[in-house]
UniProtKB/Swiss-Prot annotation:
Residues 239-270 are annotated as: Disordered. InterPro entries: Ntn_hydrolases_N, Proteasome_alpha, Proteasome_alpha-type, Proteasome_alpha1, Proteasome_asu_N, Proteasome_sua/b. It is found in: Cytoplasm; Nucleus. GO terms for biological process: proteasome-mediated ubiquitin-dependent protein catabolic process. This is Proteasome subunit alpha type-1. The gene is PAF1. The proteasome is a multicatalytic proteinase complex which is characterized by its ability to cleave peptides with Arg, Phe, Tyr, Leu, and Glu adjacent to the leaving group at neutral or slightly basic pH. The proteasome has an ATP-dependent proteolytic activity. Residues 245-256 have a biased composition (Low complexity). GO terms for cellular component: cytoplasm; nucleus; proteasome core complex, alpha-subunit complex. Its main location: cytoplasm. Belongs to the peptidase T1A family. Keywords: Cytoplasm, Nucleus, Proteasome. The 26S proteasome consists of a 20S proteasome core and two 19S regulatory subunits. The 20S proteasome core is composed of 28 subunits that are arranged in four stacked rings, resulting in a barrel-shaped structure. The two end rings are each formed by seven alpha subunits, and the two central rings are each formed by seven beta subunits. The catalytic chamber with the active sites is on the inside of the barrel.
Length: 270
């Protein structure tokens, strides 16, 4: 029994109860550049690694604004991601026109999941080969959802998708319990650190990552979804590197002091 007997059509089940075309779409998400999302009670942050197809080309956008209160980061087929981000933008505009209020983030993620699920039940369609991290703010606070090509969606405190995302997940799993009380600056630093884990030795700079944030200030005013300026990102990266180098410098200076003490010791009497 060969798999190719059951993977030519998205509506054909295998004897093991699997839809291979849907699984292939989920594998496409793992081939895209890494994206990270994390949230506190009041803010949500999205970060993405910028990967160019070749040295001669520029990178494609991975983070998109959907509305003032929400945005997405995507991994997989960027063209599919652009289509879905336009769909989400249209849903937010229609809801705001009818109800004069922003679309809750949970319903935004649900509508995206419903659209993806339809493609798993139509023989003339294919699943979207992209995974989306949906971050936003509503009356109940900040939210982060992951929407899968299968039509499933899950809410997370922190999550990572894309190539080598397991390294970022491991980093986030060690720290996510304190994220509810994090400041926006701390969230951005952890998002950048998680992206750095996926770069496999490549130096993290403001040119190879994108960061966006949305949240609510202490006085209750909403900070709209916005891309963080490249200059500010570089300043944060520089401060992170300085903080990492400080303990090493202290350890080196203390070891040198111990060596100096050893050379100044009086010789033993014979």
């Amino acid at each position: 029994m060969f798999r190719n007997q059951y993977d030519t059509d998205v509506t054909t089940w295998s004897p093991a109860g699997r839809l291979f075309q849907v699984e292939y779409a989920m594998e496409a998400v793992k081939q895209g550049s890494a994206c990270v999302g994390l949230r506190s009670r009041t803010h949500a942050v999205l970060a993405a690694a910028n990967k160019a197809a070749s040295e001669l080309s520029s990178h494609q956008r991975k983070v998109f604004r959907v509305a003032d209160h929400a945005g997405v980061a995507l991994a997989g087929l960027t063209a599919d991601g652009r289509v879905l981000s336009r769909f989400l933008r249209s849903e937010c505009i229609n809801h705001a026109f009818v109800y004069d209020a922003p679309l809750p983030v949970s319903r935004l993620a649900l509508r995206l999941a419903d659209k993806a699920q339809v493609c798993t039940q139509r023989s003339w369609k294919r699943p979207y080969g992209v995974g989306l991290l949906v971050a936003g703010l509503d009356e109940s606070g900040a939210h982060l959802y992951y929407n899968c090509p299968s039509g499933n969606y899950f809410e997370y405190q922190a999550f990572a998708i894309g190539s080598r995302s397991q390294a970022a997940k491991t980093f986030l799993e060690r720290r996510f319990e304190g994220y509810n009380d994090y400041t926006p600056e701390q969230l951005i630093k952890d998002a950048l650190s998680a992206i750095k884990e996926t770069l496999q030795g490549e130096k993290l700079t403001s040119s190879n990552c994108t960061v966006a944030i949305v949240g609510r200030k202490d006085d209750g005013t909403v900070e709209p979804f916005e891309m963080i300026d490249v200059k500010r990102i570089q300043e944060i990266i520089d401060s992170m590197e300085a903080a990492e180098e400080a303990p090493a410098a202290e350890a080196e200076s203390s070891s040198m002091q111990e060596e100096d003490k050893g050379t100044d010791a009086a010789p033993m009497d014979i």
